[in-house]
Curated annotation (Swiss-Prot):
Subunit and partners: Homotetramer.
This protein's record includes keyword Lyase: yes
Name recorded for this polypeptide: Chorismate synthase
Cofactor(s) recorded in Swiss-Prot or TrEMBL: FMNH2
EC number: 4.2.3.5
Gene name tied to this protein: aroC
Record key words, sorted: Amino-acid biosynthesis, Aromatic amino acid biosynthesis, FAD, Flavoprotein, FMN, Lyase, NADP
Pfam family membership, one: Chorismate_synt
Catalytic reactions on record: 5-O-(1-carboxyvinyl)-3-phosphoshikimate = chorismate + phosphate
Length: 367
């Protein structure tokens, strides 16, 4: 199985399975001298780890990260950073009934058809458990970004659960960390709690929309055509489990606008060019404008539900299946820190590419 690595100069390779002894990431390309500690990385992993409330899977994993290489006396050395997270709460017996069956909506059938072998215990490599390694790697990227671009801030949040969206008029950055859904709308969080609790008790699930905003992004990240910043951001988000659609800025809604409505008009401000709006999501021609970079994606409902469904076995015989085990009723909740991590990795990668090509700062002066 190939394609376990992403990135150009800042490269991340993840490894491990849901029910294996451990999983982790090898991070190559982190600049030397970046302050990195296990404690600092753990902050981000704690945001993602399961079992923290009734709205996420009750699998109890400490998700304690171990730095095995690439860091000396609290600083990166420039060599590959090996990160490991041991699995502690596997319950493989829950999956014995599906060893010969394919779960609808999961990667079971495509993995089997492509490779002729699959780890049915929790999905193996296709499990969202793999994203713990991404969050650890994202912590490294955040540390490097913090050293290179101190004012850059990456924040993910949920804007929709099932058919229920937030009220943008109530958007409050301070609310995001105050509820289990990472939403900026406190009233929506209360409504979603009752809604999701009902689905959880019924053994069902629901999808969600997640938005990630990076504030303080320098001008000039990305390149035309095949190295667009939005190309890599879209690919990064689409690689997250259960993601089925990605938008940049106004996204699909831009198709219903006129040219006048969609135009981000440009004015000269005291510190340089300013824009009347941000329909472009902070990226023009694949290159960052200095505005907020805004990415949005949709995740499908968790496929592991307690409803009896029709499927087939490896031999092609019809069968019924109920997915046992411990699962998230809304994977969008824990997708938030994963999306933040992927955004951090892509932005650092493009910052390093930009500095390597043109040096620090934009080349074309205005004013």
């Amino acid at each position: 199985m190939s394609f376990n690595t992403f990135g150009h100069l800042f490269r991340v390779t993840t490894w491990g399975e849901s029910h294996g002894p451990a999983l982790g990431a090898t991070v190559d390309g982190c600049p030397p001298g970046v302050p990195i500690t296990e404690e600092a990385l753990q902050v981000w992993l704690d945001k993602r780890k399961p079992g923290q409330n009734k709205f996420t899977t009750q699998r109890r994993e400490p998700d304690a990260v171990e730095i095995l290489s690439g860091v000396f006396e609290g600083q990166s050395t420039g060599s590959p950073i090996q990160l490991m997270i041991r699995n502690a709460d596997q319950r493989s017996k829950d999956y014995g009934d599906i060893a010969e069956k394919f779960r609808p909506g999961h990667a079971d059938i495509t993995y089997w058809q492509k490779y002729g072998i699959r780890d049915y215990r929790g999905g193996g490599r296709s499990s969202a458990r793999e994203t713990a390694a991404r969050v650890a790697a994202g912590g490294v990227a955040r540390a490097a970004l913090g050293a290179l671009v101190p004012d850059l801030r990456i924040t993910g949040y949920m804007t929709q659960m099932g058919p229920h969206g937030i009220d943008r008029a109530r958007f409050d950055w301070e609310q995001i960390d105050q509820n289990p859904f990472w939403t900026p709308d406190a009233a929506a969080a209360e409504d979603w709690a009752a809604y999701l609790d009902g689905l959880r008790k019924a053994g069902s699930s629901v999808g969600a929309v997640i938005e990630v905003t990076a504030r303080g992004v320098p001008v000039g990240l990305g390149a035309p055509i095949y190295a667009k910043l939005d190309t890599d951001l879209a690919a990064a988000m689409m690689s997250i489990n259960a993601v089925k659609a990605v938008e940049i800025g106004e996204g699909m809604a831009a198709a219903s606008l006129t040219g006048e409505a969609n135009a981000d008009e440009i004015f000269m401000g005291g510190d340089g060019p300013e824009y009347s709006s941000n329909h472009a999501g902070g990226i023009l021609g694949g290159i960052s404008t200095g505005q907020d970079v805004v990415v949005r994606f949709a995740v499908k409902p968790t496929s592991s539900i307690l409803t009896t469904r029709q499927t087939i076995t490896k031999s092609g015989a019809p069968a019924e299946i109920i997915t046992k085990g411990r699962h998230d009723p809304c994977v969008g909740i824990r997708a938030v820190p994963v999306a933040e991590a992927m955004m951090a990795c892509v932005l650092l990668d493009h910052l390093l590419l930009h500095r390597g090509q043109v040096g620090d700062g934009p080349r074309g002066a205005i004013g």
